[in-house]
Amino acid sequence: MFQANLLKDKRILITGGGTGLGKAMGRRFLELGARLTICGRRAEVLAGTKAEFDADFGGRTTTHVCDIRDPAQVEAMVEGIWADQGGLDGLVNNAAGNFLAKSETLSSRALDAVLGIVLHGTAYVTLACGRRWVAGGESAAVLSIVASYTRSGSPYVMPSAMGKAGVLAMTRSLAVEWGPKGIRCNAIAPGPFPTEGAWQRLVPNAELEAAWRARIPLGRFGEQGELADLAAFLISPRAGFINGECVTIDGGEWLKGAAQFSFMDSLSEDDWAAMKPRKGR
């Protein structure tokens, strides 16, 4: 659907790029000619994704082990990227954390764990790149992955909803502040896109999966390639007049029932106990 080499030689960083939607976006960007950098906390995951990408696209993928919750690690990573490849043309803030829980059961540690990645980590990476773009007088594009419940809120994922709402506020604030400097900031608000691992934590049984699907006017979940195509367009020069926008891609779910995880009201206490996060998992 895109012209060949739409992203030719564009240097793009994807946080959380080793798995799931981040990996899907990375593959699409490489198909369109980008030079890709992915970061994450697990070296073995990044190495596996890099090996897969290198086999398909040659050596156009670089990895950085980085916990974006730590501003010192973020600064070191971004400084290394600028030193090694002269900077970036695009940033995709994709790294996230989420789990289902009744809000009254949340500890401060659980709240901080999600906000540290979703809100603070996203801001750390964006600002580390942004101050270099501004200092160098460079144009760039920032794309942040939020959620379809960013505007409405949602029960049982309150920390994620808080963090994503903050990221959307950051996106629109910087779109105005940095727009005159040639730096575009946009967001994508995905609905349900099954990914390995995360999907099982959020949708623990077939009955809940069926109930969720029934809420979506199009009657299905999203496909990772659909989101990757949207991301490729928004990060590309062809979206050069789009700034401060948040594009929802959820099959119309938010129009039918705004609070995404409200169908979890049907869970029993045993279901909640079974889903409680366990150390080491």
Question: Residue spans of the language-model regions?
Answer:
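Short C-terminal tail/terminal secondary-structure segment
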Residues: 2-3, 243-281
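Conserved glycine-rich cofactor-binding loop
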Residues: 16-20
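The beta1-alpha1 cofactor-binding region of Rossmann-like NAD(H)/NADP(H)-dependent oxidoreductases
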Residues: 65-76, 108, 225
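Short, small/polar-rich loop/turn modules that mediate ligand/substrate recognition or access, typified
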Residues: 92, 179, 184, 242-244
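Substrate-binding pocket helix/loop in short-chain dehydrogenase/reductase
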Residues: 102-115, 208, 212
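Active-site helix of classical SDR
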Residues: 126, 163, 171
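Alpha-helical segment proximal to the catalytic Tyr-Lys
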Residues: 131, 176-180, 240
